[in-house]
From Swiss-Prot:
CDD domains: S4. Keywords: Ribonucleoprotein, Ribosomal protein, RNA-binding, rRNA-binding. Part of the 30S ribosomal subunit. Contacts protein S5. The interaction surface between S4 and S5 is involved in control of translational fidelity. PROSITE patterns: RIBOSOMAL_S4 (PS00632), S4 (PS50889). Residues 98-161 form the S4 RNA-binding domain. InterPro entries: Ribosomal_uS4, Ribosomal_uS4_bac-type, Ribosomal_uS4_CS, Ribosomal_uS4_N, S4_RNA-bd, S4_RNA-bd_sf. Pfam families: Ribosomal_S4 (PF00163), S4 (PF01479). GO terms for cellular component: small ribosomal subunit. Belongs to the universal ribosomal protein uS4 family. The lineage of its organism: Bacteria, Pseudomonadati, Campylobacterota, Epsilonproteobacteria, Campylobacterales. One of its GO terms (molecular function) is rRNA binding. The keyword Membrane does not apply. NCBIfam families: PRK05327.1, rpsD_bact. This is Small ribosomal subunit protein uS4.
Length: 208
């Protein structure tokens, strides 16, 4: 299954949760989910009871769509999490958070992960001084992420920095917004990562 590219606000309404996919509209309080907090369609306001499998599938979809992964990418990441020692669900979330596109977003250089992914693929991002154009690149603790010199005055990036100043920066990165760079200082603890996902359902789904 390929990465979802359809209307993101309709998707958020269908899943009934904010997936942080509409940055500027969300920050302005204009997201469709806030105005119409129910599924689209004629019977959208009557949500059917969800089965156990439905709950498991729903959590996987939320994680995939929020972080912008295809089914193949997500399954590969889950296998990597399951291979490591520790809580598989928590490790999965940490691996998602270590993706380069996600950290560009977390550092406030993009209002959405989708825009962050575009910045990476179009060559606007450097890691330790070298251009990296792979959104799934797993950033290591201590690595420096910065906007390429030619892109530092990009209007969209400047707008993102201005808007994300309202929301603050997560505790596991250290950012110099004026200089357009940040350091991934440590792996986050699960209780620090504020996302509407119950990863235990994902573990149950893939463990069948």
């Amino acid at each position: 299954m390929s990465r979802y590219t359809g209307p993101v606000e309709k998707l958020e309404r269908r899943l009934g949760v904010d997936l942080f996919m509409k940055g500027e509209r969300r920050l302005a309080g204009k997201s469709a989910l806030l105005k119409r907090p129910y599924a689209p369609g004629q019977h959208g306001q009557r949500r059917a009871k969800v089965s156990e499998y439905g709950s498991q599938l729903r959590e996987k979809q939320k994680a995939k769509f929020m972080y912008g992964l295809s089914e193949k990418q997500f399954r590969r990441l889950f296998k990597e999490a399951a291979r490591r020692e520790g809580n598989t669900g928590e490790i999965l979330v940490q691996l998602l958070e270590q993706r380069l596109d996600n950290l560009v977003y977390r550092m406030g250089f993009a209002t959405t992960r989708r825009f962050a992914r575009q910045l990476v693929t179009h060559g606007h991002i450097l890691v330790d001084g070298k251009r990296v154009d792979i959104p799934s690149y797993s950033v290591k603790v201590g690595q420096k992420i910065e906007i390429a010199e030619k892109s530092k005055n990009n209007p969209q990036i400047l707008r993102a920095v201005e808007l994300t100043a309202q929301t603050g920066i997560v505790a596991w990165v250290d950012v110099e917004k004026d200089k357009k760079f940040g350091i991934f200082t440590r792996k986050p603890e699960r209780d620090e990562i504020v996302i509407p996902i119950e990863e235990r359902f994902i573990v149950e789904l893939y463990s069948k």
